[in-house]
Design a protein with these regions (language model features):
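ABC-type nucleotide-binding domain
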Residues: 5, 341-592
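Transmembrane helices of ABC transporter permease
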Residues: 29, 33-43, 145-199, 270-284
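Alpha-helical segments in transporter systems
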Residues: 21, 32-53, 57, 75, ...
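An intracellular "coupling" helix at the cytosolic face of ABC transporter transmembrane type-1 domains
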Residues: 117-118, 134-143, 147, 151, ...
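Helix-loop-helix
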Residues: 64-65, 163-177, 251-320, 325-329
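Transmembrane helix-loop-helix hairpins at lipid-water interfaces of multipass membrane proteins
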Residues: 31-85, 165-170, 280-285
C-alpha cells in the first residue's frame, strides 16, 4: 500500500499544518514509476525547449535564402516526440495518482475499523466517511496537477529563462520585472488556499454526516412528517459547504487572472521593446520570435505552477485530515505487554467469567461502575437486570475489551482479560448487540463475517439452531437471498436470531447477549427464547435483560442499580428478598 508504514502515531496534531515532507511516505511504493515520470518530464522539457532555437534557425535561413527542409523535419519530429512523451508521462502520472488514492483508502479504511470504540462514540460517521471518500480523492490532484506540475514547470521555467538570457538579457530583464511582480502578488493569495480548503473539507464532512443521519432514519423521518425539516437541515449543511467552497474558489479565481494579465503584459512589453531592437539591428527577427516562444514556455509553466500550488495546498489540507485519523492509535496500541504464558487462554474448572471489584468511567465522563463483583460459573446462564443506565451493557463491553476497566479486573478462566491477546479473547466470545446490525447483502454474507470458511452445511446447521432454517428455504436463492439494507426484509425477531447465528458460527463457549428481546413482539420473543434455550446447553451465557420473562429461569440473576451490584440470586430468591427486583417484576406482571 502506498501509505506510511513507520510514521509514529499521534504525530500529526489537528491544528499543525503539514508540509510536502508528509507526502513522501505515501509515494514510497511508487518511487520507480515517479523516477520514470521525472525522466520523461525532462525529455519532454528538452524537446520543447529546443523548438524555439530551431524556429530561429529556420527563420534566419529563410532570410538568408537557404534551404530549411531538414530543419523543418527535425522541428516536426521534436513536436511529435514531445507529444508522445507527454502522453506517456500523463498516463503514468494518472496511474500513480490512482494507486496513491487506492492505497490511502485501503490504509484509512483498515485503520478506521481498528479505532478504539471510544473514537466511534465521539466522532460522526459521515465525517469519517468523507475522509475516506472526498479527502482521499483530493490526493490525486496533489500528485498530478500539484507536485509534478510544480516540478515540471520549474524545469521549463529554468530552461526557458536560461535561453532568454542568452538570446537577449535586456528583454529578459523586462520580462522578469513584469512577470515577477504579478507572480508575487498571486502567490500571496495562493498561500491562503490550504486553510480555506481544509475548512471546506470539514464542511463537506458535516454535510455527509447530516445526509447519513437522515438516510439511516428515513422511516422515522417519513412517519414523523419531518421530511421538510430534515431537508432544510441537510440543505443548511450543504450551504455551509457551498460557502466554504466559494471561499476557496474566490482565491483561486484571483490567482488565475493575475497569471493571465502578467503573461499578456509581458508579451506586449516584449513585442514593443523587441520590435524596436529588431529595427535598431540589435537582434534579428529570428531572435525575437524565439524569445517570444520562450516567453510562452516561461509564462505557461509559471501559470501552471501557480495553479498547481493552489491544488497542492488543497491536497495538503485533505492530507492533514487523513493524517489526523491515522495518528489516532489503533485499538490495543496502548495494551500492556502480553506474557508468554498468556498467549493461549487457559481452560480451568473455575468460574468462566469473574468481575472483581470492577470500576469504570467513560472517557471524559463520570464513573458508571463501582466495585462490581460477581462470578459467572462455566456452563451457566447469568442475567444482568436493573434500571436503564445501571451499567449492564457496559459490563459486556468490558468483557469484550471494547473498553478497559478503570479499577479491578475482569477475568476469563482466571486470567485478566487485559493479559490476553484480543483476537484470542474474542475468539472465545460470541457477542450480540442490543441493536444487532444486519449488513446489506445476502444471508450468506451476513453469516460469514465471523467465519469466512464455514461450509454450506455448517451455515444451515447454525440457522436451524436459532430456528431460522426457513430463511434459506423460502427463496430459490437459498442462502444467497437478499436481506435488504440493515436487514429490512427480515422481521425484528429474525434479525436478532440472525445476529445470534452469526455469533454462534465460530463455536464460542461464551455468549454475551445485550437485551436480545428488546422491541420484539411476544411471538418473536418466544422464538428467540427457544433459540437461546437451544444454544445455552453447551455454553456460558451472560445476558442483559430488560424483559425479565426471558431470564426467570436463569441460573443466577445479578441486579444492578447506579453502577453497583445490589443483589444476586434466582428469580424466586430475588422476588422474596430484593425490593428493586420485586418492583421490576411487579411492573412486568411477573408477580402479583
Amino acid at each position: 500500500m502506498s501509505t506510511p508504514k513507520d510514521r509514529p502515531v499521534g504525530s500529526t496534531p489537528k491544528d499543525r499544518p503539514i508540509g510536502l515532507i508528509a507526502l513522501l511516505p505515501y509515494l514510497r511504493e511508487h518511487l520507480g514509476t515517479l523516477v520514470v515520470v521525472g525522466a520523461l518530464s525532462l525529455l519532454g522539457a528538452g524537446a520543447s525547449l529546443a523548438q524555439p532555437l530551431l524556429t530561429r534557425s529556420v527563420l534566419d535561413r529563410v532570410s538568408d535564402g537557404l534551404g530549411v527542409s531538414r530543419l523543418v523535419a527535425v522541428l516536426v519530429a521534436l513536436v511529435l516526440l514531445g507529444a508522445a512523451i507527454g502522453g506517456l508521462r500523463n498516463y503514468l502520472l494518472q496511474r500513480t495518482a490512482e494507486g496513491l488514492v487506492l492505497g490511502t483508502r485501503r490504509r484509512l479504511a483498515g485503520h478506521l475499523l481498528r479505532l478504539p470504540i471510544a473514537e466511534y462514540d465521539r466522532r460522526r460517521t459521515g465525517d469519517l466517511l468523507s475522509r475516506v471518500g472526498s479527502d482521499t480523492t483530493l490526493l490525486r490532484a496533489v500528485v498530478t496537477s500539484g507536485l509534478f506540475e510544480t516540478v515540471t514547470g520549474a524545469v521549463m521555467v529554468l530552461g526557458a529563462g536560461t535561453a532568454m538570457v542568452l538570446l537577449d538579457p535586456l528583454l529578459f530583464g523586462v520580462t522578469l520585472l513584469g512577470v515577477g511582480l504579478g507572480l508575487g502578488f498571486a502567490a500571496t493569495f495562493a498561500r491562503r488556499v490550504r486553510a480555506l480548503a481544509r475548512a471546506a473539507q470539514e464542511r463537506v464532512g458535516e454535510m455527509t454526516s447530516a445526509v447519513e443521519r437522515s438516510i439511516s432514519a428515513a422511516r422515522t423521518i417519513r412517519a414523523s412528517r419531518a421530511e421538510a425539516r430534515e431537508t432544510e437541515t441537510v440543505a443548511g449543511s450543504a450551504r455551509e459547504a457551498y460557502g466554504a467552497g466559494l471561499r476557496v474558489a474566490r482565491v483561486q479565481a484571483v490567482v488565475g487572472p493575475i497569471g493571465s494579465v502578467t503573461v499578456q503584459g509581458a508579451f506586449l512589453l516584449v513585442l514593443g521593446i523587441g520590435g524596436a531592437r529588431v529595427a535598431a539591428g540589435a537582434i534579428t527577427v529570428g531572435d525575437l520570435v524565439a524569445f517570444v516562444m520562450y516567453l510562452f514556455f516561461l509564462a505557461l509553466p509559471l501559470a501552471q505552477v501557480l495553479n498547481a500550488y493552489t491544488q497542492l495546498q488543497s491536497g495538503l489540507g485533505a492530507l492533514q485530515r487523513i493524517e489526523e485519523i491515522l495518528a489516532v492509535p489503533a485499538e490495543g496500541a496502548d495494551d500492556r505487554p502480553v506474557a508468554a504464558t498468556a498467549t493461549a487462554i487457559p481452560r480451568r474448572p473455575i468460574p468462566m467469567i469473574e468481575f472483581d471489584r470492577v470500576g469504570f468511567g467513560y472517557p471524559g465522563g463520570e464513573s458508571v461502575l463501582h466495585e462490581v463483583s460477581f462470578a459467572v460459573p462455566a456452563g451457566t446462564r447469568t442475567a444482568l437486570v436493573g434500571p436503564s443506565g445501571a451499567g449492564k451493557s457496559t459490563l459486556l463491553a468490558l468483557v469484550e475489551r471494547f473498553y478497559e476497566v478503570s479499577a479491578g479486573a475482569v477475568r476469563l478462566d482466571g486470567s485478566d482479560v487485559r493479559d490476553l491477546p484480543r483476537d484470542a479473547l474474542r475468539a472465545r466470545l460470541g457477542y450480540v448487540e442490543q441493536e444487532a446490525p444486519v449488513l446489506a447483502g445476502t444471508l450468506r454474507e451476513n453469516l460469514l463475517i465471523t467465519t469466512p470458511d464455514a461450509t454450506e452445511d455448517r451455515l444451515r446447521d447454525v440457522l436451524d439452531e436459532v430456528n431460522l432454517g426457513h430463511l434459506a428455504l423460502r427463496s430459490p436463492q437459498g442462502l444467497d437471498v437478499q436481506v435488504g439494507e440493515g436487514g429490512v426484509l427480515l422481521s425484528g425477531g429474525e434479525r436478532q436470531r440472525l445476529a445470534i447465528a452469526r455469533a454462534l458460527l465460530a463455536g464460542p463457549p461464551v455468549l454475551l447477549l445485550d437485551e436480545p428481546t428488546s422491541n420484539l413482539d411476544s411471538r418473536n420473543e418466544a422464538a428467540l427464547r427457544r433459540a437461546i434455550d437451544a444454544v445455552a446447553v453447551r455454553r456460558t451465557l451472560l445476558i442483559v435483560a430488560h424483559r425479565l420473562a426471558t431470564v426467570v429461569d436463569a441460573d443466577q440473576i445479578v441486579v444492578l442499580d447506579g453502577g453497583r451490584v445490589v443483589a444476586v440470586g434466582t428469580h424466586a430468591e430475588l422476588t422474596a428478598t430484593d425490593p428493586l427486583y420485586r418492583e421490576l417484576a411487579t411492573h412486568q406482571l411477573l408477580v402479583g
